[in-house]
């Protein structure tokens, strides 16, 4: 038996990559901090009903489940931190006004997904609770874009949709849940013929609108076509107006904005605008987010909510290979001047590795390209 083998889609993060991930994590949490977002660390394990209540069937399938040996109750290992943040806002903080929370912790999923194709993403995100207006959506979206730009990503494309459009069509036609699910699946695959077949028994206006959703994608000019192609329902009109406002409010961040009205990611979870960020060199979304006003109700306190999250391990997969900073090799010993020089260099942020007695100091293995040497009574740095 090879005891060093790890489970499928579970892997170690080695020093160079780990150092870069940790550096980016700190930068992003500092960014969130100056925007007023407070850092929280939810538990890795919770009672199952707390983790998946109000989040839809997909999260249930993604959650590893164990039996608590203390109580006999079923517990789950978190697969998404967003519901935990909603629980903290609803019960632990219990604020009446707006609250802003952020997090950066590992989650565990039963199947691999995301850019890194891992079952153990490092989920980092920000959530805003207590405000239902488009202004909070814009705040979250701008924060997401800034976070990606801090990581050195450019040429970002942000794709938007709004689940209220599809939801309004479903409600106005009184479509039953089974057909609703089939239409949802057909729209996600942009299968126009399947949508037409499924909607064949519906009112002609609704049928044409559902079919039109598969083609309603593009830049902001597409929204004008959507206004003509979709029924004049109040919820649809508001959704399109909100999407139009988004394009105007992100124009200063040097990103491309697009719209795809058939994209319904998290339809059973989100309640309004949804969005995803893309960049060249990545096979999937860098970050995803949206509005989820109903989730807090599962914890006894419904609160408007919007947020975004990303997998930090996934985002770094397409960055240039990580390189550890070179170190300085210092000789063994307790000479006061030597120790003082070592500490002074470390205060400057330089990596200094002091050799240990009776142990060979391999400069290459230690990633050292220079050493401390004593010259004329002074400790100096010399390159190897």
Give the label of every model feature segment.
Residues 17-35, 47, 82-95, 101-153, ...:
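Positively charged, Gly/Ser-enriched RNA/tRNA-binding surfaces
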Residues 155-166, 183, 258-264:
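Short, surface-exposed recognition loops or helix-turn segments adjacent to catalytic cores
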Residues 132, 136-137, 159, 166, ...:
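Cap/lid and interdomain-hinge subdomains that line or gate substrate/regulatory clefts
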Residues 62-69, 175-197:
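Acidic, His- and aromatic-enriched active-site or binding-groove loops in soluble protein domains
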Residues 162, 190-191, 219:
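Short, solvent-exposed helix-helix connector turns and helix-capping sites enriched
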Residues 1-83, 138, 159:
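TRNA-binding/sensing appendages of the translation machinery
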Residues 44-60, 161-171, 264-272:
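Beta-rich nucleic-acid/ligand-interaction surfaces
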Residues 65-77, 183-188, 288-290, 375-384:
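Short, basic, helix/turn surface patches
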């Amino acid at each position: 038996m090879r005891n060093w083998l790890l489970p499928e889609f579970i892997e170690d993060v080695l020093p160079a990559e780990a150092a870069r991930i940790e550096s980016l994590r700190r930068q992003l949490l500092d960014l969130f901090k100056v925007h007023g977002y407070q850092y929280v660390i939810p538990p890795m394990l919770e009672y199952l009903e707390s983790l998946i209540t109000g989040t839809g069937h997909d999260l249930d399938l993604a959650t590893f489940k164990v039996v608590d040996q203390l109580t006999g109750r079923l517990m789950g290992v978190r697969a998404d931190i967003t519901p935990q943040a909603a629980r903290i806002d609803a019960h632990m903080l219990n604020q009446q006004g707006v609250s802003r929370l952020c997090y950066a912790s590992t989650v565990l999923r039963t199947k691999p997904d995301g850019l890194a194709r891992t079952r153990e993403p490092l989920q980092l995100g920000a959530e805003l609770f207590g405000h239902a207006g488009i202004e909070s959506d814009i705040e979250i979206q701008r924060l997401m874009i800034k976070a990606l730009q801090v990581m050195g990503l450019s040429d970002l494309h942000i794709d938007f949709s709004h689940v209220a459009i599809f939801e309004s069509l479903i409600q106005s036609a009184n479509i039953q849940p089974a057909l609703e699910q089939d239409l949802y699946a057909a729209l996600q695959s942009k299968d126009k013929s399947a949508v037409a077949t499924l909607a064949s028994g519906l009112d002609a206006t609704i049928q044409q609108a559902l079919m039109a959703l598969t083609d309603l994608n593009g830049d902001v000019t597409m929204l004008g076509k959507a206004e003509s192609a979709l029924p004049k329902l109040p919820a649809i009109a508001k959704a399109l107006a909100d999407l139009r406002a988004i394009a105007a409010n992100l124009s200063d961040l040097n990103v491309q904005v697009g719209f795809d009205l058939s994209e319904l990611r998290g339809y059973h979870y989100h309640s309004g605008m949804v969005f995803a960020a893309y960049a060249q060199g990545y096979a999937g979304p860098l970050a995803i987010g949206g509005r989820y006003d109903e989730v807090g109700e599962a914890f006894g306190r419904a609160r408007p909510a919007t947020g975004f999250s990303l997998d930090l391990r996934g985002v770094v997969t397409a960055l240039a290979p990580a390189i550890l900073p070179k170190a300085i090799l210092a000789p063994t010993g307790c000479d006061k001047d030597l120790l003082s020089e070592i500490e002074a260099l470390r205060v400057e942020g330089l990596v200094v590795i002091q050799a240990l007695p009776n142990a060979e100091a391999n400069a290459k293995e230690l990633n050292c390209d220079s050493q401390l040497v004593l010259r004329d009574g002074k400790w100096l740095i010399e390159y190897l």
